[in-house]
């Protein structure tokens, strides 16, 4: 949730904290960024059980007990709330902190309170009355109470001001003395509020209010696998984002900056699909973001619909799936047996399971009838990796020097905070052996199977190969894998008809395309009127075909910000799981 979608403001940050970052994580960009920070004397803090790599060059190091990062972070939040070192203006204007929470008993308890038009609202400081959250001139009141309903901020403060989050209560478990935790919180507060920076730049927010400057809290954070490789990793990442938000450091000068096309409204992402029928393609994308328990990948009897058990009560937020569970689950026949295992450059016994011997046994194990438990394995790779010996069918791939590749804004972006960008690779030499680029093989397979997206109305193949697909495929009208040089004349950016000369234009430009945003669009992307309107026009934010066809939740800057705004501690999508557990919302979990 850090390097893929954003990065610290290397130019302005004064205080940079690393959580669980090893030297091979996000290696080159963070090395360059750290070089900039050290070169101008910014303070670097490492939180990691061992002091190697990046932590070795940190100005201070906190040798935390593994898996307790979230507890430390929430203790820092406790200290900041206790000291009143919280960016109240940021929380009120740019987050859901001033929204009211339904506190009435019943199925809506704990969810965001809605008005008669089913829209969330706030109490306006000017009038003391309910007002639209995104209304022009509205001044949301964080401390308001309306008919017994309190704000998200009040619920959050009440929770984390509890004594169980005090440094003295967590010190032993974290392995960090209480005095050091309090000192760290004081440092964060000092830099954020006493060393704030202000950039003189006129900009207009989504409400239509104009500002003369951009206020920044020059504190930034970066976290990697060290926090996520624990059963509490999801909640630890949430806690760290909460800390950033409370300090007012998200999308402000010196803080954490999104890389376009992010931030995106939730509705711009697909939901996972899992309904299958013989002879028909899947009902939609197999990965995505669940909005509630009714979208979990469960069969009618409550059993997992996917072999990896992603998007279940056990693993509800599996945006990328659970690849490491594929072979163990297939071998166990849990939740079901499989016929064929198809892998691409996935040397799973060696680089994904952390249990090489056991996985090799699973791949060759037989049942009581002498048949392989995993009957067939198809494998594609450019190299003769160890996995080749276990495959029944091998599809030799090309190397990256022999094929076209596309690094797309539709996937993990290579953008920078100030610019949207994508790129290609193109063949510099022809293969001298009997191999085919795997992407082209997939395009061919799609056509042979008659999949709708790969064939014309007459059943003929729609694309010649992957290069043809890159240029001519459209995810939405005018939006394809590459954003540069679109349109029949090649002058459109982001949205435009396919351009037959697009790949050549990329090659002439060093294989890259880049669109720089103006200084007015640099910060507050989630609330910046000009950025949101331009991002919509370029197709960076918008709907997902087949998921929300009109998807015009972002057709105006106000609507875009309403959906892309920063969520604080309370999120309806998460609260719905508690409701389902309690028997509300039409879906109930089992005891697990």
Residues of each region from the PLM?
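Long, C-terminal catalytic modules of enzymes
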Residues: 419-517
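Beta-sheet entry/capping signal
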Residues: 14-16, 41-45, 59-61, 109-111, ...
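Extended redox/cofactor-interaction regions of prokaryotic respiratory oxidoreductases
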Residues: 1-47, 71, 241-390, 399, ...
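Active-site phosphate/pyrophosphate-binding segments
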Residues: 152-157, 163, 168-318
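Acidic/polar loop patches that form or flank catalytic/metal-binding clefts of enzymes
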Residues: 86-90, 179-182, 195-197, 220, ...
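Flexible glycine/proline-rich, aromatic-decorated loop/lid segments
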Residues: 53, 391-423
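Long, well-ordered, tryptophan-enriched scaffold segments
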Residues: 55-56, 60-209, 213-214
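Glycine-rich, charge-decorated loop segments at or immediately adjacent to ligand/cofactor-binding or catalytic sites
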Residues: 51-61, 385-393
């Amino acid at each position: 949730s850090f390097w893929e979608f954003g990065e610290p403001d290397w130019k302005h940050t004064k205080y940079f904290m690393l959580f669980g970052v090893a030297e091979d994580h996000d290696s080159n960009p963070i090395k360059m960024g750290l070089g900039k920070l050290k070169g101008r004397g910014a303070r670097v803090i490492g939180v990691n059980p061992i002091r190697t790599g990046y932590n070795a060059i940190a100005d201070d190091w906190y040798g935390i007990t593994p898996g307790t990062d979230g507890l430390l972070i929430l203790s820092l939040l406790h200290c900041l709330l206790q000291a009143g070192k919280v960016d109240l203006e940021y929380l009120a204007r740019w987050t859901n902190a001033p929204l009211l929470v339904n506190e009435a008993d019943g199925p809506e308890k704990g969810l965001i309170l809605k008005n008669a038009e089913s829209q969330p609202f706030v109490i306006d400081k000017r009038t003391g009355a309910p007002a639209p959250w995104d209304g022009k001139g509205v001044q949301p009141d964080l401390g308001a109470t309306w008919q017994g309903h309190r704000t998200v901020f009040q619920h959050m403060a009440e929770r984390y001001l509890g004594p169980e989050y005090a440094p003295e209560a967590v010190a032993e478990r974290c392995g960090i003395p209480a005095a050091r935790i309090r000192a760290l919180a004081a440092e964060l507060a000092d830099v954020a509020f006493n060393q704030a920076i202000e950039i003189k730049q006129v900009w207009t927010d989504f409400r239509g209010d104009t500002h003369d400057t951009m206020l920044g809290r020059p504190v930034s954070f970066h976290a990697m696998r060290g926090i996520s490789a624990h059963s509490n990793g999801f909640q630890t990442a949430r806690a760290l984002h909460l800390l950033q938000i409370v300090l007012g450091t998200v999308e402000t000068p010196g803080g954490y900056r999104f890389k376009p096309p992010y931030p995106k409204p939730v509705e711009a992402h697909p939901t996972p699909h899992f309904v299958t029928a013989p002879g028909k393609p899947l009902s939609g994308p197999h990965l995505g973001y669940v909005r509630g328990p009714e979208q979990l990948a469960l069969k009618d009897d409550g059993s997992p619909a996917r072999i990896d058990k992603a998007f279940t009560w056990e693993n509800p937020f599996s945006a990328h799936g659970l690849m490491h569970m594929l072979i163990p689950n297939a071998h166990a026949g849990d939740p079901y047996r499989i016929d064929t295992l198809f892998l691409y450059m996935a040397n799973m016994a060696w680089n994904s399971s952390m249990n090489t011997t056991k996985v090799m046994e699973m791949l060759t194990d037989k049942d009581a009838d002498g048949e392989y438990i995993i009957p067939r394995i198809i494998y594609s790779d450019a190299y003769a990796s160890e996995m080749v010996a276990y495959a029944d069918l091998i599809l030799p791939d090309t190397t990256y020097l022999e094929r076209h590749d596309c690094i797309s804004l539709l996937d993990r972006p290579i953008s920078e905070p100030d610019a949207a960008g994508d790129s290609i690779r193109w063949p510099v030499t022809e293969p001298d052996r009997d191999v085919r680029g795997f992407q082209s093989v997939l395009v061919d397979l799609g056509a042979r199977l008659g999949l709708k997206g790969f064939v014309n109305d007459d059943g003929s193949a729609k694309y010649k190969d992957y290069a043809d697909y890159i240029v001519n495929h459209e995810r939405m009208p005018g939006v394809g894998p590459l954003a540069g040089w679109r349109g029949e004349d090649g002058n459109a950016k982001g949205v435009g008809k396919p351009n037959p000369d697009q790949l050549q234009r990329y090659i002439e430009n060093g294989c890259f395309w880049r669109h720089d945003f103006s200084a007015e669009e640099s910060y507050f992307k989630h609330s910046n009127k000009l950025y949101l309107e331009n991002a919509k026009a370029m197709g960076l934010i918008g709907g997902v075909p087949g998921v929300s066809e009109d998807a015009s939740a972002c057709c105006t800057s106000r609507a875009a910000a309403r959906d892309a705004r920063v969520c604080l501690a309370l999120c309806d999508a998460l609260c719905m799981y508690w409701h389902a557990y309690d028997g509300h919302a039409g879906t109930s979990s089992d005891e697990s």
